[in-house]
Amino acid sequence: MAAENPASFGSLGDVRRAGEVLRRAQIAQGSVPTQEEVRSARRVVEAYRSAHAEPLDAAYRELQLCLIAEGLDAEVSLRLKRLPTIEDKVRRLPTMDLSTMQDIGGCRAVLKSQDEVQRVIDRFRANSLERNQRPDKIRDYVVQPQESGYRAVHIYTRFHGRRIEVQVRTREQDSWAKIVEDLTSRTGVDFKSGDGPDEVHDLLRRLSELLSQRVPGQPPTDEPLLDILTRLAMMSALGHVVQSFGQGTGED
């Protein structure tokens, strides 16, 4: 990837202001920016996004080295958050300062067990402490799952002065996240952001709980788990039904 060029997006203040322009453009509150202001803001944000490419590559390599050092096999991936996704996050979080967004660049390791997850986290954080001379921030959504049922451990670190998010999760936790993404893709309802009918979210939370109790690597054979998976599969196939769930028919 191309080397980072800080001048391409100006200053962090420019990034912050660009984020505010894009927020105002989406929620149509206050002084609505002109089309040229929006285009200019997007150029700044795209340049800032691109500035995370090299730091993300460095984080990805570091994560792979940790896996090698621990003798672990894992599915490892990386991604730069897409511009539409950045804009959507700025819209959903009205106090979000774009210049401090921690997950523009992110990489992930998916492992067999929670024990392996912890080994990777411990080694990664030890290496980061030596490199940055300060501890990484960590959010443990396994000890305290999100309300949605999401489970994983997130490490917030820095490479080349840029914030990078590293997610470490088990295969069961990854399967749950993929189910949510598949539901969102097939139904057009953003379940990941909390949209959609309560019944679906209740099923997802219960599914997350059941998956957390399973022995890693064993196929799902217990009846409650299979029942939830079947119901979610049906909802995914009938996306138009899920989308209108709970909205009523408009009739008395």
PLM feature segments, named:
Residues 112-116:
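Helix N-cap motif at beta-to-alpha junctions
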Residues 109:
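Residue(s) in the substrate-gating loop at a strand-loop-helix junction
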Residues 91-102:
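Short, flexible, solvent-exposed loop/turn segments with mixed acidic/basic and small polar residues
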Residues 97-99, 130-131, 181:
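Basic nucleic-acid-binding interfaces
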Residues 2-45, 49-51, 162-252:
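An acidic, glycine-/histidine-flanked metal-binding catalytic module
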Residues 59, 117-123:
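Hydrophobic side chains in well-ordered alpha-helices
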Residues 124-159, 163:
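Short Gly/Thr-rich strand-loop-strand
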Residues 5, 38-92:
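Surface-exposed, low-hydrophobicity interaction/linker segments
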